[in-house]
A protein has these predicted regions:
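Conserved catalytic-core segment of NTP-binding enzymes
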Residues: 1-72, 76, 82
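Secondary-structure transition/capping residues
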Residues: 21, 73, 91, 113-117
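Residue-level detector of alpha-helical recognition elements and their boundaries
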Residues: 39, 95, 117-120
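C-terminal boundary of histidine-terminating zinc-finger modules
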Residues: 84-100
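Histidine-centered active-site loop/cap adjacent to the catalytic His
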Residues: 95-115
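A short, charged, Gly/Pro-tolerant segment at domain boundaries
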Residues: 104-108, 117-130
Length: 130
C-alpha cells in the first residue's frame, strides 16, 4: 500500500523588495489553501542602513504583509558574498551576523528555543518605523 505524505512545514524566503514580499504573500495564500500546518518567514538580505533611511521595507512591514511568523532575518553583509566566492559556508564564520542568523534559523527549525538576538531587535526592528 502506498502512503501519501505531505510536508508539514513551509519556509517562505523573501527579500525586502516589494515584488518579493508580494510573491511571498501570494505563496502563503496558496500554502494555506493546501492546509500546511506551519508556515514560517525568512527575510534575506536585510540592510539596517537602508531600512533606517527609508529605502527598504522594515521587518515589521514585511511581517504585517506576509502575516506568518518570522523564523529569522539574514543581514545583507559582505561575509556572505565572500563565503560564496571562496566556497565556504557563512555559518562557519562564527563572528558573522549572517552566519549566526543562519545557525539560529536551523536551531529554531529543530525545535530549539532561540530568541531573536537583542542586537537584531535593536538594529532591525527599531529602524524603519516612522
Amino acid at each position: 500500500m502506498l502512503m501519501s505524505s505531505k510536508a508539514q512545514k513551509a519556509l517562505i524566503i523573501a527579500t525586502p523588495e516589494l515584488i518579493s514580499v508580494r510573491d511571498a504573500d501570494m505563496t502563503v495564500s496558496k500554502l494555506e489553501g493546501l492546509h500546511f500546518d506551519e508556515i514560517y518567514l525568512i527575510i534575506n538580505k536585510i540592510s539596517v542602513e537602508m531600512v533606517k533611511s527609508g529605502e527598504m521595507m522594515s521587518i515589521d512591514d514585511i511581517i504585517n504583509i506576509v502575516a506568518v511568523p518570522l523564523i529569522g532575518a539574514i543581514p545583507d553583509e559582505k561575509s556572505v558574498i565572500h563565503s560564496n566566492n571562496i566556497g565556504k559556508p557563512v555559518v562557519l564564520k562564527t563572528r558573522s551576523r549572517a552566519g549566526m542568523a543562519y545557525a539560529n534559523i536551523a536551531k529554531r527549525l529543530t525545535g530549539v528555543k532561540v530568541p531573536i538576538l537583542e542586537d537584531e531587535k535593536k538594529r532591525f526592528f527599531r529602524f524603519g518605523r516612522k
